[in-house]
């Protein structure tokens, strides 16, 4: 009976530890972030001062709302940084100013040089 009781207590302790440990996985993925930005590409490649499309701003707001945890924010930042490095003809000023033009405040600049490890 002592072995069963010890096993039960050990299982309960493990359950309590697992139940109180925050989930360390990001909800957002790079595929979601980069795929969602399709309506923004024309604006981000533009070399003239044009209005941001409403569909683009809706995406920016949606991504901002989806990035609730620090890990989500860092994931989104890393994906945006990766995209900024990969998109041919990207207007870096347009990318950096996109959140503000959509009325969104994010804790970093969309840039190929952003340090996403500092995002909280």
UniProtKB/Swiss-Prot annotation:
Tell whether Acetylation is among the UniProt keywords. Answer: no
Signal peptide location: 1-26
Disulfide bond annotation, renumbered to this chain: 30-79, 40-56, 57-102, 77-116
Q: Which UniProt keywords apply?
A: Disulfide bond, Lipid-binding, Signal, Transport
Expression by tissue: Expressed in protoderm cells of somatic and zygotic embryos, and transiently expressed in epidermal cell layers of leaves, flowers and seeds.
Q: Name one Pfam family in it.
A: Tryp_alpha_amyl
Q: Which Gene Ontology MF annotations are present?
A: lipid binding
Origin: domain of life: Eukaryota
Q: Which GO terms describe its biological process?
A: lipid transport
Which InterPro entries did the record assign? Answer: Bifun_inhib/LTP/seed_sf, Bifunc_inhib/LTP/seed_store, Plant_nsLTP
PANTHER family, A to Z: NON-SPECIFIC LIPID-TRANSFER PROTEIN 2-RELATED (PTHR33076)
* Record function comment: Plant non-specific lipid-transfer proteins transfer phospholipids as well as galactolipids across membranes. May play a role in wax or cutin deposition in the cell walls of expanding epidermal cells and certain secretory tissues.
Write out the similarity annotation.
Answer: Belongs to the plant LTP family.
The name under which this protein is listed is Non-specific lipid-transfer protein
Q: What is this organism's lineage?
A: Eukaryota, Viridiplantae, Streptophyta, Embryophyta, Tracheophyta
Point out the gene that encodes the protein: EP2
């Amino acid at each position: 009976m002592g072995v069963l009781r010890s096993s039960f207590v050990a299982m309960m302790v493990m359950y309590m530890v697992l139940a109180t440990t925050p989930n360390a996985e990001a909800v957002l993925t790079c595929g979601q972030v980069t795929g969602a930005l399709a309506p923004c590409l024309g604006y981000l490649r533009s070399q003239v001062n044009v209005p941001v499309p409403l569909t683009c701003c809706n995406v920016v707001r949606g991504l901002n709302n989806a990035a609730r945890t620090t890990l989500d924010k860092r994931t989104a930042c890393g994906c945006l940084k990766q995209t900024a490095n990969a998109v041919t003809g990207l207007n870096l000023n347009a990318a950096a100013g996109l959140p503000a033009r959509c009325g969104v405040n994010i804790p970093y600049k969309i840039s190929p040089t952003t340090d996403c490890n500092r995002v909280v």
